């Protein structure tokens, strides 16, 4: 699409040049790059989520605590506690079936098309071609494109949102929070999740312009937030990832999906260097 051409020819080049000038671009690696990637991703993700969803009061994502940790990591990097090793308990992306072959085909095709062109430019005819069915078959199940998109969101978002929330809930009581976050990021940024990452990103972008989509996704986000919030109460007082930083970590993960578009090399980062640790916490609380 034209948008992707502009990203590749202009935006990606400019961002990579800027990062290279700071010594943290695609041609470099290490703790500094990891910290900058984390900081940029957090800002990108928080900006998008806060603009797409109807957050009010303390429900808005405040990335201050995470940004403090990432800034400290640049000046006082902490080596990973474990050596490189194969990812444990890696789970590839699982497409949730509806047990209806035609519906599954249409939702899978919608995910594919939306991930590549966005919701507003995804056409019923293109989705039908991808699914291998006629346009009439779509209108036999759905009133219009909006109802197909709504069903697609309803099938795909809740199970993945639940899994994400459950994964992050484990972080709060983990003896080594950094190791758990490392596994989460390594799994999420794996090739298996690439299409889901793009689909999720395009859906949230569409929510900025569609009240119906925003309302639907906000409901899923609220459920995930409550799960994470309950789990965060069990975090030790001195833990680097507590209520504030744990909730705002949702923005970091989404932001990686944004940064990945302009710098695909971040998918190969050594996530053991993710800047999380007690050394970056002040007075027992992330500031």
Language model features with spans:
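Helix-turn-helix
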Residues: 113-151
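Extended intrinsically disordered, low-complexity coil regions enriched in Ser, Thr, Gly, Ala
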Residues: 7-30, 219-226
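Hydrophobic alpha-helical connector segments
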Residues: 39, 164-197
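Hydrophobic/aromatic-rich alpha-helical bundle segments in the mid-to-C-terminal region
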Residues: 8, 26-87, 214, 218, ...
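N-terminal positioning helix adjacent to the helix-turn-helix/winged-helix DNA-binding module
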Residues: 35, 102-109, 123, 196
